[in-house]
Amino acid sequence: LTKYLIAAIAVLTTVCSVRADEGMWLMMLVKRLNGKDLQKQGLRLTAEEIYSVNNSSLKDAIVQFNGGCTAEVVSKEGLLFTNHHCGYDAIAALSTPEKNYLKDGFFAMNNKEELPAKNLYVRFLVRMDDVTARINGKLNPQMSADERRAVIEAEYKAIQKENSENGKYTVVVRDFFSGNEFYYFVYQDYKDVRLVGTPTESIGKYGGDTDNWEWPRHTGDFSVFRIYGDAKG
């Protein structure tokens, strides 16, 4: 009995002493919260290289693809990679019975062969900021839930108008941590997006939820696009 008791105490002591640095952090908070700790654990990027408003950083390479996916910009010419299933609808829309890019695949050999995709956009994060104090300054404990909601929504609209530069940017305001903090995000959308390459459907289609939890699994779940824009974006 004694040895089991000692073993149980040892396990509990070990569990209690384990510190889990896990979770998700807003990019602008990495420097303040845990930037030095991440570097001690082997991260080679500085907080400034992860998120910077004035200089190129990781935030400029990881983008939103058509609202529901992410993509990675891999060249200064706007080439980007995303999942095959993220580009699926655009590839399907470009396909015809004669040129079934979805079934047979497609790779442009030069810029002229790239195919303009309709109703597709890529969204870059320009900057984000904390507006918790501003919004909380408009609230008071005596407000009803409806009054609180109305004040917050009005402030959201004001923040969006102040930062959109007459529609140049898309501005999104979100609450975090169960409504205790508020941040706004300024995005720039690029709508001239062209298909550069996609594998055949038999290679690219990853199988959805049916195959998503099966291993080993080998799929080429990728597609390649390029963003075009003028000097003003």
Predicted regions and their residues:
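Terminal presequence/propeptide segments associated with secretion/organelle targeting
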Residues: 16-233
